[in-house]
Every structure is written in structure tokens, then in C-alpha cells.
Amino acid sequence: MMFGKSCQVMVKPTGSVCNLDCKYCFYLEKEKLYPDRKNHYKMSEETLELFIRQQIAAQDIDEVIFAWQGGEPTLIGIPFYRKAVEFQQRYCGGKTIVNTFQTNGILINDVWATFFREHDFLVGVSIDGDAALHDEWRVTRSGKPTHEKVENAVRCLAQHDVEFNTLTVVNRTNMHHPVQVYRYLKSIGSRYMQFIPLVERCGENGLAQPQDKHIAMTPWSVDSLQFGQFLNAVFDIWIREDIGDIGIQLFEQTLAAWCGLPPQVCVFAPTCGSAFAMEMNGDVYNCDHFVYPQFKLGNIHQKTLRQMNQGEQNRQFGSDKQRSMAQECHRCQWKFACYGGCPKHRFLPSASGATNHNYLCAGYQAFFSHTATAMSAMRTLYEKGISPAEIKSIFV
């Protein structure tokens, strides 16, 4: 990885504050880092302007992405984002600005949808399947179901021609229903899907930090092999019916690896780094999964994003992924597609005795093995200048 050329920042204007109480949410635990968050949870205009100036200045490429997340980013209100767009236009310097926005959908209405459409926001909606699967975990703070409101949000976005995709957390419940989940997401109009494996461990005082190795999994975490089987079931439908029409992040990333293209998903890159998380007060961390004091890079009021991106701590964090890879990974036939996965998930014992083997290894191996024939065929099409989507005719 070429550190310092560009960086991505997942910015959280409301920190961990959210209007839901999802039973599996790892980010609610981060509120302990900011105990006064309930009184000071909104990013100031000063911090917003400084962030936008620095994010644009930190990029040595022509496209600048702003990724708004949470907590729940709608809680800060539309005027905040109108100001953000104003600052982006003021400081863009001819660069192309792209805004992405990840939401639980609860507050989405015609006003929000109109704003998103007006400014070409790409909106990600968190939804875990149909009502029975979604409402098992994603509930309000009073324990009420949320699926109906989320489905209404999707419908509202579609009516206003807002480009949206879906993010589905694969957990202990919906992992058993891959076909049901996939067909449901298709039915609501999702044309790009992300399937995120839920892997969380529980320490005595809450969720585990990365260095905590010998503690139990949470009961809502996905089973590794079952995650692979989930992906395989979805893949078998997708390649026969929907390739070329529906994008699935993990499938596209795997094909890119087979074709020798640069990884677009940090989980499967050889190194980490330059994919930061920023809290409402300007604190910047190495990664959204490593929002702990020891991984804090600094604050944008004292140090610029470019300085953090080019700094030694970021370089060290990035190269640590490669150095800490398990021995099994170096010998694995799927190393080119996986590179040991996310460091957050490396806590199982490896052959060397170190606790650095990825929890999801069995699932990834099942997926890579199952899809190898199709991936190889699509690579051949790609090398001939033919769209890999043409493989659909072979599998019909």
C-alpha cells in the first residue's frame, strides 16, 4: 500500500449516539470513550469545516469521498449536511466530491430523500432481511420492531430516485436463511448488497479489545463455516440469475483478486492503513474497528489528516497486518484473495501457537473453494475483453 497518497475517513457527526438499540451493535460500546456524549454529541460547524478542508487537501487524487456514518447520522439534522455541501463546494478546488451516507432508515422521509437526490448522495440502508429476521436484533430503545419503518425508508428513497444500497449484518439468526435474505433484498429493489459477518467477543466490562484473545464469543456472532455456506447459497443464485444486474461487494472483490486487480475492500488487502474513523470532536482513529485509545492518531484541531495519514503510527498499523499473518495464511492457496482477513478477527490459535488465526477462516475457505471454478471462468472472460457477466449463460 502506498501510504500518504490518499485516505478514507468514516466520519461520525453524532459519535455513537443512535436512536436504535440493536442487540449486536459493537459501536454503542464506544460511548465509554466519550462519557459526556449525551450533552455534547453533535459535531460543531468549526470541526465540520476543518474536516472538509483537510479531507480534500489530504487527497492526491481527483475524487474525494465523504463517508457519513454513526451511530445514526440523521440525528444531527439536514442543516448540518447542507452546511457540509456548502463547505465542499467552497474548498473542492476542482476535485469531484462524492457523499455516501449509512443510515438505519428510521428518520428518512420525503425531506431527507429530496436532499439526498438534490446532492447525489449514495445512501446505504442497514437491513437484515425480512421482518422476522430483521426485528430479532434491530429494535428501538424501548424494544419495539423497526422493520416497517426501514422498509418505508427504502420505498421513500426509491420514489425520489435516490441511489441506495443495502448493508446486511450476517448474524446467528439470519445466517441460516441465505436464500430468504437475498430474495427479500432483491424484492425491495436493492441492486448492491454488502454482507457483513458479525464477529464480536464479550469481555468482563463489555466488548473485547483487539489484544484480548482468550474470551468468549457473543451469542449473536455468526458461525464461521455457516457464514461461508451463507455466501455460497447466495452466490449460486446470483451467478445464475443476477450477475451484471446486482452487485455484491464480496463477490466483486473476490473476482478482482482473481483478475489481479487492486483490492477495493480493506479486509482483503495485504496491508491496512488509511481507512480512518473520526469522532464528532475531531478525534481520528486508525480504523472503525479499532476505536480504542491506543489506536488514536490525533485530533484534526492539532494535526492534519495528511499528517496522520503520512505518519509513522499509520504506517506501522498498516504493515502490522502483514507481519502478524498466521503461518497457515502464508501457505494457503487463497492467500491472494484473503491475506488473512481483518486483524480484528485474528484471535484463534494458529499452528505456531500464536493467537493470530482468523475466526472466519473456515467460512472464507468454504467460499473461495466453492466459487473457484466460476471465478476462474470469469477471469478468462475478463482477459478476453468479455464481460464476466456473460458467465450467466453457462450456468442457466
Please tell me what each predicted stretch does.
Residues 140-148, 155, 159-267, 271, ...:
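Radical SAM enzyme [4Fe-4S]-AdoMet core and its adjacent flexible, acidic
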Residues 3-46:
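Canonical Radical SAM [4Fe-4S] cluster-binding loop centered on the CxxxCxxC motif
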Residues 291-396:
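Flexible mid-to-C-terminal extensions adjoining Fe-S/redox cofactors in radical SAM and related proteins
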Residues 48, 52-53, 57-67, 76-208:
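Radical SAM/AdoMet-radical enzyme domain recognition
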Residues 18, 22-25, 266, 272, ...:
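Short cysteine clusters
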Residues 9-12, 65-71, 98-103, 248-250:
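Extended hydrophobic secondary-structure segments that form protein cores and membrane-embedded regions
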